[in-house]
């Protein structure tokens, strides 16, 4: 990390944008992955196995990516996180746009799980690095807005899927 500390406000905006993008991307695939898989012809058992493979890829890749980051301190965490998220986004787009068989789906879900799930602890580590250096990053605000983006994306995906206007959904939640 360089000796010049970044502007705290600018850093907050970047951190909030990163959290928002991560959780929106996570919601777009993860919240409905079982429905996506069964809609593509996989059985419930196969869908469960595929989801487990995705999670297992995250469990395996998370310590590997963290170890890589520790062994290469010259590579900023933001680059590792950015590359992880770009790879995961590309895999997510392939998954959403191109239906495929079991082998292709496993390959795409391994990339998605390995990089998307592994990037979140590194985002936390970035925030902790700045906090340790005395930069007053608003971690809780970024995390809260990220969670809000997850909820918003889920609502918009549901309203688009069931053709229900968002105000009807909000009204039913209020009742």
What are these regions (language model features)?
Residues 2-55:
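Helix-loop boundary and gating motifs at the non-cytosolic
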Residues 167-175:
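Symmetry-related core transmembrane helices of the 12-TM Major Facilitator Superfamily/SLC fold
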Residues 58-59, 137-158:
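Glycine-rich segments within core transmembrane alpha-helices of 12-TM secondary carriers
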Residues 20, 91-92, 98-120, 126:
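Hydrophobic core of transmembrane alpha-helices in multi-pass small-molecule transporters
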Residues 127-138:
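Paired intracellular helix-loop junctions of major facilitator superfamily
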């Amino acid at each position: 990390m360089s000796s010049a500390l970044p502007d705290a406000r600018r850093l907050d905006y970047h951190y909030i944008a990163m959290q928002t993008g991560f959780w929106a991307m996570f919601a777009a695939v993860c919240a409905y992955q079982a429905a996506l898989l069964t809609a593509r012809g996989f059985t419930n058992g196969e869908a469960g196995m595929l989801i487990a493979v995705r999670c297992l890829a995250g469990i395996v890749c998370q310590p590997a990516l963290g170890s890589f980051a520790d062994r290469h301190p010259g590579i900023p965490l933001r680059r590792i996180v950015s590359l992880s998220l770009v790879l995961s986004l590309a895999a997510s787009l392939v998954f959403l746009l191109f239906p495929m068989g079991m082998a292709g789906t496993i390959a795409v879900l391994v990339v998605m799980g390995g990089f998307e799930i592994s990037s979140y602890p590194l985002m936390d580590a970035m925030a902790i690095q700045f906090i340790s250096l005395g930069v007053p990053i608003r971690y809780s605000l970024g995390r809260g807005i990220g969670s809000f983006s997850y909820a918003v994306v889920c609502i918009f995906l549901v309203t688009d899927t069931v053709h229900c206007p968002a105000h009807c959904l909000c009204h039913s939640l209020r009742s």
